[in-house]
């Protein structure tokens, strides 16, 4: 059993709550503000102590590079995201319908969540209405890959094609038109890479 100081327990609980509420970990500055530390450096020291004790894992060089151990996150399984509420992060608790008991490592790269597919725009690659698309959270995307993209409050599954300051989100169904996004005029967020499909 991991033994933590009272302050370390507070930091760990804040990390868990932040991930549950938003889908991603807090920054050092957010931890400092919430717990009344004088600086982000104080939060960093507590995070290093938690990592040394095995309570968290840290990813070097990332402002939100805090992970809960796989044993803790895999107990629930992979979250299934249904209708994405406008203005909420994709893994906000409001969007999670249930959990699937498959381990994230079932997919390569590992799946961070399932997105319940709506519509038939990707049917020609076997992604059908109601399927669960396994998604690996990353913004490192290459042309030709299938991605989960957010345009404003809309979330869509399409094939990614970057052309200078423009992105084409391509369907795999001739009945649907490509979505063209001018990056200088419209925000586009990549919510992850499609890494597999299951049908239940």
From Swiss-Prot:
Entry-linked HAMAP family: LexA (MF_00015)
GO term, biological process aspect, one: proteolysis
Organism classification: Bacteria, Pseudomonadati, Pseudomonadota, Gammaproteobacteria, Oceanospirillales
EC number: 3.4.21.88
Site note Cleavage, residues: 86-87
Annotated catalysed reactions: Hydrolysis of Ala-|-Gly bond in repressor LexA
Feature: DNA-binding region: 28-48
Active site per database record: 121, 158
Family per record: Belongs to the peptidase S24 family.
Subunit structure: Homodimer.
Enzyme superclass (EC): hydrolase
Protein name: LexA repressor
Key words, A-Z: Autocatalytic cleavage, DNA damage, DNA repair, DNA replication, DNA-binding, Hydrolase, Repressor, SOS response, Transcription, Transcription regulation
Function, in words: Represses a number of genes involved in the response to DNA damage (SOS response), including recA and lexA. In the presence of single-stranded DNA, RecA interacts with LexA causing an autocatalytic cleavage which disrupts the DNA-binding part of LexA, leading to derepression of the SOS regulon and eventually DNA repair.
Domain of life: Bacteria
Example GO molecular function: serine-type endopeptidase activity
UniProt xrefs under InterPro entries: LexA, LexA-like, LexA/Signal_pep-like_sf, LexA_DNA-bd_dom, LexA_repressor, Peptidase_S24_LexA, Peptidase_S24_S26A/B/C, WH-like_DNA-bd_sf
Pfam families referenced in this protein's UniProt entry, alphabetically: LexA_DNA_bind, Peptidase_S24
